[in-house]
From Swiss-Prot:
The gene is fliE. It comes from Salmonella typhi. It comes from the Bacteria. InterPro entries: FliE. GO terms for biological process: bacterial-type flagellum-dependent cell motility. This is Flagellar hook-basal body complex protein FliE. Belongs to the FliE family. One of its GO terms (molecular function) is cytoskeletal motor activity.
Amino acid sequence: MAAIQGIEGGISQLQATAMAANGQETHSQSTVSFAGQLHAALDRISDRQTAARVQAEKFTLGEPGIALNDVMADMQKASVSMQMGIQVRNKLVAAYQEVMSMQV
């Protein structure tokens, strides 16, 4: 989480610098933070994986009303969500490294 806060701080500094260069005043925004959005996305990925695992366990135990095609679809949704999360993380790390390597 420290890396996420570092990225958020860097982005805020860049935005303040860009606004100052354009002659605009900097003011705090009351919108949701980048870190908050990232945390919410990670929670949704985790929830989707948990739901798929629970449904697979119910199917394995033979509970009625749980079809194999529903289990497989939910498992694929969870897998795609995780892969997307990993790709977003990789892009964020690459962007952070690029920003940190810039000369001021």
